[in-house]
Amino acid sequence: MSERASRETWRLKRRVDHIPRMLRDLSPASQSKRLVVLGRSSALQGLVRQIVIWLGFVVGFALVSSLAGNRAHVALANGLRVVEAEKWLLHGLPELVVQRTVASSAVLTFLTVLTYRASEFVVVSAALVWVYLRRRWAFTQFRNTIFAASLVALVCYFVLPTAPPRMFPGLGFVDTVAHAGGPSRDPGVLSLAANEYAAMPSLHAADALIVGVTIALLARRRLVKVVALLWPAWVWLCVMATGNHFALDVVAGSVVAGLSGAAVHAHARAFPSSSADSPASALR
């Protein structure tokens, strides 16, 4: 009997020992920790979903855009029209001055080529991830503005295929990216579906402006704001220095960015429930 009583006492003690743990699990602090874990898990799943959407959009855009790249004679003629327009409006070709200035410095050449190759996909992707993780309430508008600008540009590439400056060596332009080594367009699988006549408007210029303004508005540190505001101007210089866009391409890209941002913002105000994420879900 004493052995049986001892076992019952031990079992009762184990049950009693579990009570503080159960109470701790029911405490506000414990519940808060669980909510944080669930929130982070949900954020990770959401991030993966958004990455898939973004990559799908990029691949789809490249494939559709490539369908507009088979009218070389039209694109070259339109490129010459841009040249004539710049000579009339600007009394010259500012891209030539930019190219020659940058070409005089190996460091500047390296930086402009690196920026051209990375600014369109790498930087935009990084900005999307940062906004999603740190300012998720602004993510939908940011992403949709990128999408809208890309779709407007895509329509322009079909309607108005335009050759970039690098295709006019007779005017003094140089394909800086090709001379630096590697493909003229973005590296990787997407280069197989690249549209060589997608100069007007400059999507590099449009996306740089969208990214720069968005990060400047959302960032808290002054240095980050300043760098973000300078980013578009630097990209604009780089796309001209590498011979990939005329100045008018950059202007057109900036207009596309502005109109896309205004349209997405107007839609968000008209339909707030479908155009914004909850601030409470953002990871600080």
Which residues make up each language-model segment?
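N-terminal transmembrane-helix/juxtamembrane module of multi-pass inner/ER membrane proteins
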Residues: S2-V123, L283
